Each structure stands twice: as C-alpha cells, then as structure tokens.
Amino acid sequence: MSYESPQAAAVAWLPYSQLATDIDQPTLDWLFDEGSLTRRLTRLSIDHFSVTPLFEGWQPLRDDECQALGIAAGAEGWVREVYLRGHGQPWVFARSVASRSALERGGLDLETLGSRSLGELLFCDQAFIRHPLEVCTYPQAWLPSEAAHAALWGRRSRFERNGLDLLVAEVFLPALWQAAKEENR
C-alpha cells in the first residue's frame, strides 16, 4: 500500500507536563512507558507478536515531522509504516521517519528491516538516545483506512545517534486496549 500521509492542521504533540486532559492511569502507563514497546507487546501477547510492513519508501515528510527533526518543511525522508500485532490483530500502527541526509550520514539501512521490529534495533543499540515522549490525539486522516478511528492516542519520540535522527510515532488501536484490559482482570 503506497500513499502519502496528508498534512493535518494544528496537531498538538504534548509532553506529559503539558497534558490538560484527564487520562486514566492505564492509558498514561502505555503512553509514557519509556521502555521498548516491542518487548511490552511481546509480553502481553505471550510471544505471539509480529510486525506487518504496510509501506516503506521515500516521500516528503509531514510538516510536524520536519519540525520535530529540525529539517526544512517538505524535506524528503524514509518512511516506514507497520502494524505491530498481537495474536494476529493490529494493536499499534507505527510510523517511523528519517531524513535522507541523516540516513546517508548515519549509516543505518532501514530498507532491510522487513518484518523485523525497529524497536529491537533502537533498544539494543546503546548509542541511541531517546528524547522525551510526546502524545496527541492522532489525526484519523494519517491512519490507514482500515485502522481509521477518531480520538486514538498516539505517542512519538525522537531517537538520536551520532547525527542520525529517527522519529517514531506509535498509535494505540482499540484491539490493544481490549487485550490490556483482559490482562488486568
């Protein structure tokens, strides 16, 4: 599936300290967990975790992504969109982006990840520094049509290693909340 993610006006990505809405504690725990989401999903799924690539390729990055990466608006970058699945169900929609120039400088080949988790790579390489998490109500227009629901929580953070910046956004889909609720029973 190849498509360009449309721009959405005025998306407010906020750190924990600036959230002005009441969010229940289990949701906050997922949104601001600084550990590996891949590992947490693997535990929740009792090792029935998988990654399904949806799109990988070069395209102009969204304005909010360019701003977060500190690059010019409309810059081209590598975009990777996947579903993180538990028991075959899409639990998380993830979009990872990096500018072309950063990838050329940073020596990381995202094109060869395939169905492997980017999170495994980021959390196994101690040289990557994770910047603070930010959250938003993720725009429905940015989601694949089969996952397009209103008012889904998304989070993102920037990972940095020797001049290579990657921006990773993760959107928590309804099936994840159901699985997490069942685990807590």
Swiss-Prot record:
GO biological process: pyruvate biosynthetic process; ubiquinone biosynthetic process
E.C. no: 4.1.3.40
Catalytic activity: chorismate = 4-hydroxybenzoate + pyruvate
Bilayer-spanning residue ranges: none
Top-level enzyme category: lyase
Subcellular locations according to the entry: Cytoplasm
Primary localisation category: cytoplasm
Cytoplasm is among the record's keywords: yes
Record pathway: Cofactor biosynthesis; ubiquinone biosynthesis
GO cellular component annotations of the record: cytosol
GO MF term set: chorismate lyase activity
Gene3D superfamilies in UniProt: Chorismate lyase-like (3.40.1410.10)
Any Pfam family hit: Chor_lyase
UniProt superkingdom: Bacteria
Binding-site list for substrate: 80, 118, 170
Keywords tagged on the record: Cytoplasm, Lyase, Pyruvate, Ubiquinone biosynthesis
Protein family (similarity comment): Belongs to the UbiC family.
Reported function: Removes the pyruvyl group from chorismate, with concomitant aromatization of the ring, to provide 4-hydroxybenzoate (4HB) for the ubiquinone pathway.
Descriptive protein name: Probable chorismate pyruvate-lyase
Source organism of the structure: Pseudomonas putida (strain ATCC 47054 / DSM 6125 / CFBP 8728 / NCIMB 11950 / KT2440)
Lineage: Bacteria, Pseudomonadati, Pseudomonadota, Gammaproteobacteria, Pseudomonadales
Gene field: ubiC
